[in-house]
């Protein structure tokens, strides 16, 4: 690639659609996104050439027609000491404009992703937006949807299944009716998409139990309405041979603004501007995710009949805070101390069986 921007541990390629190619959690060296060691286009995008890896910005159609074409960019120094790189273009189909701002703030481990979707025409136009976030996966990788997720659905909402354990055929595949824990990448024999049905919380995440690290995607679910994953599956060679040489399998954790499905177009009225904000960060050593915000991620897992894991990881340094586990009014566990992106709070706690 002839031109790239290195942005505090992140590599961004304006030359290839503004793709955020990789980002490293500097506390443990974990690649928050799937880092493809090669640029190896294949016939996937709307106009053909498409690469895997990092983050793809999909406006105003999925795998937009310019995802492999140079986009505009600008770096801004902000008054609080943060920096923002803006990426965007006037797209070819409707002559509408999109812009993505990636901001790194002093003392924060998250990337603040600001989106602007602008209809600068006098026409009512259809629009769809999804951030396509890829992560490295293997048999230890788990997709973490919010605990309130009861069902997942397919494209066009024409198949539904229970989550996380499926009990019905899904996308013409009968094996899902056999009690498959669909949160584990290894349990999907074929390529598939699963969308959260009726998103009620503000995050989608993935966790690698082998590397003890993961990726957290946070956004107001009233605006960031969509959450899904796409995978080629363990038996596919698309992601391991066609789209890369040696970088392995990946999964796509996608989050959609103003849309909860694909295709789920909404209308953009003449001269209307729509905006949204994400917060993305790496998590570590906490065994998964059950809840989270831009300030911290939390986990609670039952390890046995009488023990649970309690974990928390913050996005900034706190000299002292308190983590509590309660059952009704009863305090089962409390711990006070420092916490930071590099120092999560993780304990096992005895509970009644």
Tell me the role of every PLM-derived stretch.
Residues 1, 52-110, 237-266, 270:
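Extended, loop-rich substrate-binding clefts of extracytoplasmic carbohydrate-active enzymes
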Residues 2-12, 73-75, 115, 267-282:
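Short Pro-Gly-centered flexible turn/kink motifs
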Residues 10-27, 87-138, 278:
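Acidic, contiguous internal or C-terminal segments within carbohydrate-active enzymes
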Residues 15-26, 32, 123-128, 132-273:
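A contiguous, surface-exposed recognition patch within enzymatic or periplasmic domains that forms
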Residues 270-271, 303-305, 340-346:
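Solvent-exposed, conformationally flexible loop/turn segments
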Residues 285-318:
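Surface beta-strand/loop "capping" patches
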Residues 306-337:
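Beta-strand-rich binding/interaction modules
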Residues 323-324, 349-353:
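Short, aromatic- and glycine-rich surface loops/edge beta-strands on solvent-exposed regions
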């Amino acid at each position: 690639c002839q031109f790239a921007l290195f942005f505090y541990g992140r590599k961004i390629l304006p030359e290839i659609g503004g793709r955020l190619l990789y980002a490293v959690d500097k506390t443990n060296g974990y690649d928050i996104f799937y880092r493809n060691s090669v640029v190896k286009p294949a016939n996937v995008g709307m106009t053909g050439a498409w690469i895997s890896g990092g983050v793809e910005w999909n406006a105003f159609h999925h795998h937009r027609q310019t995802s492999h074409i140079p986009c505009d960019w600008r770096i801004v120094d902000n008054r609080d000491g943060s920096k923002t790189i803006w990426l965007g273009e006037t797209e070819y189909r409707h002559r509408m404009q999109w812009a993505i701002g990636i901001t790194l703030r002093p003392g924060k481990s998250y990337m603040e992703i600001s989106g602007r979707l602008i209809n600068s025409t006098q026409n009512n136009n259809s629009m769809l937006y999804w951030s396509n976030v890829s992560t490295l996966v293997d048999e230890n990788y788990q997709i973490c949807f919010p605990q309130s997720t009861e069902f997942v659905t397919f494209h066009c909402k024409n198949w539904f299944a229970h989550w996380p354990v499926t009990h019905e055929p899904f996308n013409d595949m009968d094996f899902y009716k056999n009690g498959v824990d669909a949160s584990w990448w290894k349990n999907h024999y074929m390529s598939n998409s699963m969308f959260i049905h009726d998103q009620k919380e503000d995050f989608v995440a993935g966790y690698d139990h082998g590397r003890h690290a993961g990726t957290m995607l946070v956004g107001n679910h009233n605006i960031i309405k969509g959450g899904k994953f796409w995978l080629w599956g363990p038996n596919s060679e698309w992601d391991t041979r066609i789209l890369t040489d040696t970088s392995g399998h990946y999964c796509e954790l996608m989050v959609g603004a103003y849309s909860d499905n694909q295709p789920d177009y909404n209308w953009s009225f003449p001269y209307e501007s729509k905006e949204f904000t994400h917060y993305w960060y790496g998590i570590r050593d906490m065994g998964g995710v059950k809840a989270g915000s831009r300030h911290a991620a939390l986990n609670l897992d039952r390890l046995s009949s009488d023990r649970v894991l309690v974990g928390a990881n913050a996005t900034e340094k706190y000299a002292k805070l308190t983590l509590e586990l309660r059952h009704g009014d009863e305090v089962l566990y409390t711990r006070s101390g420092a916490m930071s992106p590099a120092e999560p709070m993780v304990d096992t706690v005895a509970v009644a069986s």
